Protein backbone atom coordinates (compact mmCIF):
# COMPACT_ATOMS: atom_id res chain seq x y z
CA UNK A 1 0.00 0.00 0.00
CA UNK A 2 1.12 3.57 -0.68
CA UNK A 3 2.09 5.70 2.32
CA UNK A 4 1.58 9.43 2.57
CA UNK A 5 4.80 11.52 2.53
CA UNK A 6 4.07 12.57 6.13
CA UNK A 7 3.77 8.97 7.36
CA UNK A 8 6.84 7.93 5.39
CA UNK A 9 8.89 10.69 7.04
CA UNK A 10 7.54 9.82 10.49
CA UNK A 11 8.43 6.14 10.11
CA UNK A 12 11.87 6.91 8.69
CA UNK A 13 12.54 9.09 11.76
CA UNK A 14 11.35 6.32 14.11
CA UNK A 15 13.54 3.72 12.40
CA UNK A 16 16.49 6.10 12.56
CA UNK A 17 16.02 6.40 16.33
CA UNK A 18 16.27 2.63 16.82
CA UNK A 19 19.68 1.54 18.13
CA UNK A 20 22.26 0.10 15.76
CA UNK A 21 22.68 -3.66 15.67
CA UNK A 22 25.79 -4.48 17.76
CA UNK A 23 29.00 -4.36 15.76
CA UNK A 24 30.11 -7.72 17.12
CA UNK A 25 26.96 -9.39 15.78
CA UNK A 26 27.41 -7.77 12.37
CA UNK A 27 30.95 -9.18 12.35
CA UNK A 28 29.61 -12.61 13.33
CA UNK A 29 27.19 -12.53 10.38
CA UNK A 30 29.98 -11.54 8.00
CA UNK A 31 32.21 -14.31 9.33
CA UNK A 32 29.59 -17.01 9.00
CA UNK A 33 28.99 -16.12 5.34
CA UNK A 34 32.67 -16.92 4.75
CA UNK A 35 33.13 -20.60 3.87
CA UNK A 36 36.63 -20.43 5.34
CA UNK A 37 35.40 -19.17 8.73
CA UNK A 38 36.39 -21.38 11.67
CA UNK A 39 34.93 -21.63 15.20
CA UNK A 40 38.12 -19.93 16.40
CA UNK A 41 37.29 -16.84 14.30
CA UNK A 42 33.81 -16.70 15.82
CA UNK A 43 35.13 -17.04 19.37
CA UNK A 44 37.62 -14.23 18.77
CA UNK A 45 34.84 -11.79 17.80
CA UNK A 46 32.54 -12.77 20.69
CA UNK A 47 35.38 -12.51 23.21
CA UNK A 48 35.66 -8.80 22.36
CA UNK A 49 32.03 -8.19 23.40
CA UNK A 50 31.80 -8.67 27.20
CA UNK A 51 28.00 -8.33 27.31
CA UNK A 52 27.43 -11.07 24.74
CA UNK A 53 30.11 -13.25 26.36
CA UNK A 54 28.51 -13.08 29.82
CA UNK A 55 25.06 -13.91 28.47
CA UNK A 56 26.31 -16.83 26.37
CA UNK A 57 28.02 -18.32 29.41
CA UNK A 58 24.84 -17.83 31.47
CA UNK A 59 22.83 -19.79 28.90
CA UNK A 60 25.31 -22.62 28.36
CA UNK A 61 25.63 -23.09 32.14
CA UNK A 62 21.84 -23.19 32.64
CA UNK A 63 19.99 -26.27 33.86
CA UNK A 64 18.65 -26.82 30.33
CA UNK A 65 22.06 -27.99 29.06
CA UNK A 66 22.92 -29.90 32.28
CA UNK A 67 26.64 -29.96 31.53
CA UNK A 68 28.90 -31.96 33.87
CA UNK A 69 31.09 -28.94 34.66
CA UNK A 70 30.84 -25.17 34.52
CA UNK A 71 31.86 -23.54 31.23
CA UNK A 72 34.02 -20.48 31.77
CA UNK A 73 34.95 -19.43 28.24
CA UNK A 74 33.31 -18.94 24.85
CA UNK A 75 35.97 -21.26 23.43
CA UNK A 76 34.56 -24.10 25.56
CA UNK A 77 30.96 -23.03 24.91
CA UNK A 78 31.32 -23.56 21.16
CA UNK A 79 32.40 -27.17 21.82
CA UNK A 80 29.16 -27.93 23.69
CA UNK A 81 26.71 -25.75 21.73
CA UNK A 82 28.12 -26.03 18.23
CA UNK A 83 29.08 -23.29 15.79
CA UNK A 84 25.60 -22.41 14.48
CA UNK A 85 23.86 -22.58 17.86
CA UNK A 86 26.43 -20.19 19.29
CA UNK A 87 25.96 -17.80 16.37
CA UNK A 88 22.18 -17.92 16.72
CA UNK A 89 22.40 -17.31 20.46
CA UNK A 90 24.56 -14.22 19.83
CA UNK A 91 21.94 -12.96 17.35
CA UNK A 92 19.15 -13.62 19.84
CA UNK A 93 21.01 -11.73 22.56
CA UNK A 94 21.39 -8.77 20.22
CA UNK A 95 17.66 -8.84 19.41
CA UNK A 96 16.78 -8.98 23.11
CA UNK A 97 18.89 -5.87 23.67
CA UNK A 98 16.70 -3.95 21.20
CA UNK A 99 13.44 -4.65 23.03
CA UNK A 100 11.72 -2.03 25.21
CA UNK A 101 12.28 -2.60 28.92
CA UNK A 102 8.70 -1.71 29.83
CA UNK A 103 5.43 -3.16 28.61
CA UNK A 104 4.65 -0.18 26.40
CA UNK A 105 1.43 -0.03 24.37
CA UNK A 106 0.21 -3.23 26.04
CA UNK A 107 2.92 -5.10 24.11
CA UNK A 108 4.42 -7.96 26.13
CA UNK A 109 8.08 -7.99 25.08
CA UNK A 110 8.80 -11.37 26.72
CA UNK A 111 5.92 -13.13 24.96
CA UNK A 112 6.94 -11.42 21.71
CA UNK A 113 10.49 -12.70 22.15
CA UNK A 114 9.32 -16.27 22.77
CA UNK A 115 7.21 -16.09 19.61
CA UNK A 116 10.13 -14.72 17.58
CA UNK A 117 12.61 -17.30 18.86
CA UNK A 118 10.29 -20.24 18.20
CA UNK A 119 9.39 -18.88 14.77
CA UNK A 120 13.13 -18.63 14.05
CA UNK A 121 13.80 -22.21 15.13
CA UNK A 122 10.83 -23.66 13.24
CA UNK A 123 11.79 -21.70 10.11
CA UNK A 124 15.27 -23.19 10.45
CA UNK A 125 13.81 -26.73 10.63
CA UNK A 126 11.62 -26.15 7.58
CA UNK A 127 14.52 -24.65 5.61
CA UNK A 128 16.52 -27.83 6.09
CA UNK A 129 13.69 -29.79 4.50
CA UNK A 130 13.52 -27.78 1.30
CA UNK A 131 17.24 -27.29 0.81
CA UNK A 132 17.80 -23.61 1.63
CA UNK A 133 20.14 -22.06 4.19
CA UNK A 134 18.69 -22.83 7.66
CA UNK A 135 20.65 -20.09 9.37
CA UNK A 136 19.39 -17.38 7.01
CA UNK A 137 15.85 -18.56 7.79
CA UNK A 138 16.61 -18.46 11.51
CA UNK A 139 17.56 -14.77 11.18
CA UNK A 140 14.46 -14.03 9.09
CA UNK A 141 12.22 -15.74 11.65
CA UNK A 142 13.90 -13.96 14.55
CA UNK A 143 13.41 -10.52 12.99
CA UNK A 144 10.15 -11.05 11.08
CA UNK A 145 8.05 -9.02 13.55
CA UNK A 146 10.61 -6.41 14.60
CA UNK A 147 8.56 -3.62 13.02
CA UNK A 148 6.16 -4.09 15.95
CA UNK A 149 8.94 -2.97 18.29
CA UNK A 150 9.25 0.30 16.35
CA UNK A 151 5.49 0.91 16.65
CA UNK A 152 5.48 0.00 20.36
CA UNK A 153 8.21 2.51 21.12
CA UNK A 154 7.37 5.41 18.83
CA UNK A 155 3.63 5.11 18.07
CA UNK A 156 2.33 3.44 21.26
CA UNK A 157 -1.20 4.88 21.22
CA UNK A 158 -1.90 3.76 17.66
CA UNK A 159 -0.21 0.40 18.22
CA UNK A 160 -2.30 -0.24 21.33
CA UNK A 161 -5.46 0.40 19.33
CA UNK A 162 -4.41 -2.04 16.59
CA UNK A 163 -3.45 -4.70 19.16
CA UNK A 164 -6.91 -4.41 20.72
CA UNK A 165 -8.57 -4.86 17.32
CA UNK A 166 -6.53 -8.02 16.72
CA UNK A 167 -7.11 -9.37 20.22
CA UNK A 168 -10.88 -9.03 19.91
CA UNK A 169 -10.87 -10.78 16.54
CA UNK A 170 -11.90 -7.72 14.58
CA UNK A 171 -8.94 -8.03 12.23
CA UNK A 172 -5.56 -9.64 11.68
CA UNK A 173 -2.92 -7.38 13.22
CA UNK A 174 -1.29 -6.33 9.96
CA UNK A 175 -4.68 -5.21 8.61
CA UNK A 176 -5.50 -3.43 11.88
CA UNK A 177 -2.19 -1.56 11.67
CA UNK A 178 -2.93 -0.51 8.10
CA UNK A 179 -6.35 0.79 9.19
CA UNK A 180 -5.05 2.68 12.24
CA UNK A 181 -1.57 3.83 11.14
CA UNK A 182 -1.60 3.57 7.36
CA UNK A 183 1.01 0.82 7.05
CA UNK A 184 2.02 -2.37 8.86
CA UNK A 185 4.91 -3.84 10.82
CA UNK A 186 6.21 -5.73 7.77
CA UNK A 187 7.01 -2.50 5.92
CA UNK A 188 8.64 -0.92 8.98
CA UNK A 189 10.53 -4.12 9.82
CA UNK A 190 12.00 -4.18 6.31
CA UNK A 191 13.08 -0.55 6.71
CA UNK A 192 14.78 -1.49 9.98
CA UNK A 193 16.77 -4.45 8.65
CA UNK A 194 17.83 -2.31 5.69
CA UNK A 195 19.16 0.23 8.19
CA UNK A 196 21.02 -2.59 9.91
CA UNK A 197 22.44 -3.64 6.50
CA UNK A 198 21.18 -7.18 6.47
CA UNK A 199 20.90 -9.04 3.16
CA UNK A 200 18.32 -7.83 0.63
CA UNK A 201 16.60 -11.24 0.72
CA UNK A 202 15.91 -10.76 4.43
CA UNK A 203 14.30 -7.35 3.87
CA UNK A 204 12.23 -8.84 1.04
CA UNK A 205 11.06 -11.70 3.27
CA UNK A 206 9.97 -9.37 6.05
CA UNK A 207 8.27 -6.90 3.68
CA UNK A 208 6.28 -9.56 1.79
CA UNK A 209 5.20 -11.96 4.55
CA UNK A 210 1.48 -11.07 4.78
CA UNK A 211 -1.77 -11.14 2.83
CA UNK A 212 -1.88 -9.66 -0.63
CA UNK A 213 1.79 -8.66 -0.30
CA UNK A 214 2.84 -12.31 0.14
CA UNK A 215 5.20 -13.51 -2.57
CA UNK A 216 6.36 -17.04 -3.33
CA UNK A 217 9.97 -17.58 -2.28
CA UNK A 218 11.45 -20.49 -0.32
CA UNK A 219 12.46 -18.26 2.60
CA UNK A 220 9.03 -16.60 2.82
CA UNK A 221 7.42 -20.06 2.75
CA UNK A 222 9.48 -21.14 5.76
CA UNK A 223 8.93 -17.96 7.76
CA UNK A 224 5.21 -17.72 6.96
CA UNK A 225 4.60 -21.33 7.98
CA UNK A 226 6.79 -21.05 11.09
CA UNK A 227 4.87 -17.96 12.17
CA UNK A 228 1.52 -19.75 11.87
CA UNK A 229 2.85 -22.85 13.66
CA UNK A 230 4.17 -20.76 16.57
CA UNK A 231 0.76 -19.09 16.90
CA UNK A 232 -1.20 -22.35 16.64
CA UNK A 233 0.95 -24.05 19.28
CA UNK A 234 0.84 -20.91 21.46
CA UNK A 235 4.62 -20.56 21.64
CA UNK A 236 4.69 -16.98 22.91
CA UNK A 237 2.67 -14.21 21.29
CA UNK A 238 3.37 -11.49 18.76
CA UNK A 239 0.05 -9.79 19.46
CA UNK A 240 -1.75 -11.40 16.52
CA UNK A 241 -3.88 -14.45 17.44
CA UNK A 242 -5.19 -14.83 13.86
CA UNK A 243 -3.89 -18.08 12.31
CA UNK A 244 -3.80 -18.40 8.51
CA UNK A 245 -3.87 -21.65 6.55
CA UNK A 246 -0.91 -22.16 4.24
CA UNK A 247 -1.52 -20.72 0.76
CA UNK A 248 -1.34 -23.38 -2.00
CA UNK A 249 2.16 -22.37 -3.16
CA UNK A 250 3.57 -22.62 0.38
CA UNK A 251 1.73 -25.89 1.09
CA UNK A 252 3.24 -27.32 -2.09
CA UNK A 253 6.76 -26.26 -1.09
CA UNK A 254 6.42 -27.71 2.41
CA UNK A 255 4.48 -30.83 1.48
CA UNK A 256 1.13 -30.36 3.19
CA UNK A 257 -1.44 -28.26 5.00
CA UNK A 258 -0.60 -26.37 8.18
CA UNK A 259 -1.78 -29.26 10.38
CA UNK A 260 0.11 -31.80 8.27
CA UNK A 261 3.34 -29.80 8.51
CA UNK A 262 2.89 -29.47 12.28
CA UNK A 263 2.35 -33.23 12.62
CA UNK A 264 5.46 -33.93 10.56
CA UNK A 265 7.63 -31.84 12.89
CA UNK A 266 6.92 -34.05 15.90
CA UNK A 267 7.30 -32.87 19.49
CA UNK A 268 8.57 -29.27 19.61
CA UNK A 269 8.43 -28.86 23.40
CA UNK A 270 12.21 -29.20 23.83
CA UNK A 271 12.74 -26.48 21.23
CA UNK A 272 10.33 -24.20 23.11
CA UNK A 273 12.16 -24.86 26.38
CA UNK A 274 15.40 -23.84 24.70
CA UNK A 275 13.69 -20.65 23.46
CA UNK A 276 12.71 -19.88 27.05
CA UNK A 277 16.35 -20.20 28.10
CA UNK A 278 17.48 -17.92 25.25
CA UNK A 279 14.76 -15.40 26.17
CA UNK A 280 15.93 -15.27 29.78
CA UNK A 281 19.48 -14.38 28.72
Feature-to-residue mapping (PLM):
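Short, surface-exposed acidic
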Residues: 200-204, 254-265
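ATPase catalytic-site recognition across NTP-hydrolyzing enzymes
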Residues: 251
